[in-house]
């Protein structure tokens, strides 16, 4: 018994030394990690700060501002989604909401080269898709309800989103900074795609038409359509800034021709408009419409 205790006492210094070695190694690890975190922060923080600075840095040499309409000046996509939900309920015996919505998107995409965008094109796709998913079994009274759903989108009030009218009114009266002509003001335009009469009616119902020098409604927002807009506004591409919610339609093609762009995401996006986003020196991102005044 005494021999066992004696041997144990002899091992105590060794055990203590091992523990101290482990503690020392752990402390050294923590110190290295702390130093590494600081180094990483030194590398990362300037990037974040520079990115944030670039996002709010004022755009230069701008003489004309073009605005998208739907989901930029007024809400629209959420109404389309409500109609689509009711539509899927009407056709629930022929498939799940997910299946019918997927089939509808496919039908819309197929019809776009011939029908373009807008409520009327959407209504035709609703009817065509109903016939397709039901294999021709959908009843006439259901078709009538579907047509009514589509037509309901033609009578939206197009109420301007928060901050829109106040901001546009400010820009309408604002003098261009660093312009050769001290009294030169921005040219304002609505640049939107869709069906002509529907878009014109929404603009009039919104009450915003009086602020704009040019209203251009196109079948699609291609780079060439942006170049035509520049000619109509009598500005060079690098003197134009496009403001909109769709990266695919409002941002990417504008940047492609050398214009600037301001992206204001809407809370919901049509599946057809979803695309990969990227950064660009002439791109600014804002979350509220009023922030447009900070980048111009």
Task: Spell out what each predicted region is.
Residues 56-103:
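Active-site neighborhood of HAD-like aspartate-dependent phosphohydrolases
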């Amino acid at each position: 018994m005494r021999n066992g205790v004696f041997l144990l006492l002899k091992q105590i210094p060794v055990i203590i030394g091992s523990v101290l070695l482990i503690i020392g190694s752990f402390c050294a690890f923590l110190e290295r990690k702390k130093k590494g975190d600081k180094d990483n922060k030194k590398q990362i923080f300037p990037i974040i700060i520079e990115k944030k600075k670039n996002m709010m840095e004022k755009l230069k040499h701008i003489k004309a501002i073009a605005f998208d309409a739907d989901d930029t000046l007024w809400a629209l996509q959420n109404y389309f989604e409500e109609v689509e939900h009711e539509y899927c309920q009407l056709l629930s015996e022929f498939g799940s909401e997910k299946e019918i919505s997927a089939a509808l998107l496919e039908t819309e995409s197929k019809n776009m080269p011939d029908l373009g965008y807008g409520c009327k094109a959407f209504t035709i796709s609703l009817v065509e898709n109903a016939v397709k998913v039901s294999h021709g079994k959908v009843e006439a009274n259901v078709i009538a309800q579907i047509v009514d759903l589509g037509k309901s989108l033609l009578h939206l009030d197009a109420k301007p989103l928060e901050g829109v009218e106040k901001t546009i009114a400010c820009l309408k009266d604002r003098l261009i900074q660093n312009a050769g002509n001290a009294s030169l003001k921005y040219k304002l335009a609505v640049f939107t795609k869709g069906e002509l009469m529907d878009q014109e009616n929404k603009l009039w119902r919104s009450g915003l038409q009086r602020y704009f020098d040019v209203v251009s409604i196109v079948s699609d927002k291609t780079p060439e359509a942006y170049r035509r807009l520049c000619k109509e506004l009598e500005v060079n591409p690098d003197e134009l800034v496009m403001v909109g919610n769709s990266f695919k339609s409002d941002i990417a093609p504008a940047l492609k021709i050398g214009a600037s762009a301001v992206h204001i995401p809407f809370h919901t996006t049509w599946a057809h408009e979803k695309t990969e986003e990227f950064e660009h020196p002439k791109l600014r991102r804002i979350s509220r419409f009023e922030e447009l005044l900070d980048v111009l």
